[in-house]
Amino acid sequence: HLCDRRQRQMCIRDRYTVIIYVMKQIFIFLVILFSLTPTVYSQNAPLKLGAERMDVVTRLLKDKRVGLVVNQTSILEKRQIHLLDALVAEGIDVKKVFAPEHGFRGTGDAGEEIKDSRDLKTGIPIISIYGKNKKPSTEQLGDLDVIVFDIQDVGARFYTYISTMHYVMEACAENNKEFIVLDRPNPNDFVDGPIRQKGFESFVGVDPLPILHGLTVGELAWMINKEGWLKSTPDTCRLKIVKMENWKHGDPYWLPVKPSPNLPNDQSIRLYPSLCFFEATNVSVGRGTYYPFQVLGFPDPKYGNFTFTPTSLPGFDTNPLQKDKVCYGIDLREYPFEGGLTLRFFLDFYNKAGKDQAFFFSRPNWFDLLAGTKQLRYQIVRGLSEKEIRESWKPELDQYKAMRKKYLLYPDYPTQNKK
């Protein structure tokens, strides 16, 4: 019996030893886990837009007379409130709003001239800076201390909101006004396409950028300012950027509000840089349908089996190309496209044109302005492949990528070769 008791005691001691060992291992594991937790949470923390850092914004604007460059995309996502309304509620002295292409509410057709008006809710004047007057005048800036830019870009050089930003920066530099950018993500965050060449400056190519510039509007403003691209003045503007929090290049971003009438969803935004070239041809990109920049077609069955008929659609396009004509082509609404720039669709339609190729570029000068060069059109006519065309872009793109690195406010892609 004594032996049995000793054996039981030894077994109990052994069990305690095992339990203590296991508890030590658990404790070590928990220490390691909790030491990593802050990093894990910071990586998964929610995105905070520049406009949502309201404590920073109000501190910058306190006791100043403010002008806003905003439209329907200037939303604080978490609060679902427009920046104008949020600033007024904070007691900020907003004197006037400057509206880009499509207007303050984003309802104007592409290219439509927007008239000056007043915001129905606040009574604040709204001044159009799209059309004849592309930047604020000295008189319009006279009663302002600072201009705030908060508009969602889509990352393409020919999307005109960044052209508006450039001209407003010029006006601020000319009149010694402070310019503040509230930063937002780039949903087409790639670097690709030909660089805009000298002689091809236009409202769809103000700055010497590739078609996909791979920058946020804040980073782009910094580049424009420091590279001396403000042509109307030797001065730089007094630039400040309210950065986003918890964002890095390459992070996916889905827009909560459509940036313009004919980019109604994320698929259209992804396809836009590649399909915009068709705007210089007679091929319809779906304007006048409920799926613009997601279909392609022309009134000839040789272009494809999918059919659609552009019509006058208020809120999209009231006078679309190929209006009331049955167009044959392709449906890209479900096309698995990750984004970037591709010429495959354009080259496919050009090759299908056959004997009609001589008339394919209905507006060759407009195509060259979109491309930023005449070389792309010449290369297509000569029959070069997409690979060969891309090779011609590489030297200047490499130079641009090196310059781009200097102006990054956020961690870059895993590799610089993302496209």
Write out the residue ranges for each language-model feature.
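Single conserved hydrophobic/aromatic residue that forms the stacking wall/gate
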Residues: 1-14
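Active-site loops and adjacent core secondary-structure elements that bind or stabilize anionic groups
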Residues: 10-11, 279-289, 296-301
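Sec-dependent N-terminal signal peptides
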Residues: 26-36
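Glycine-rich, charge-decorated loop segments at or immediately adjacent to ligand/cofactor-binding or catalytic sites
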Residues: 106-111, 180-201
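Glycine-rich oxoanion-binding loops at beta->alpha junctions
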Residues: 115-144
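Glycine/threonine-rich flexible loop motifs
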Residues: 153-165
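Conserved anion/nucleotide-ligand pocket segment
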Residues: 201-274
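Conserved functional hotspot residues or short segments at active or partner-binding sites
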Residues: 292, 296-394, 419
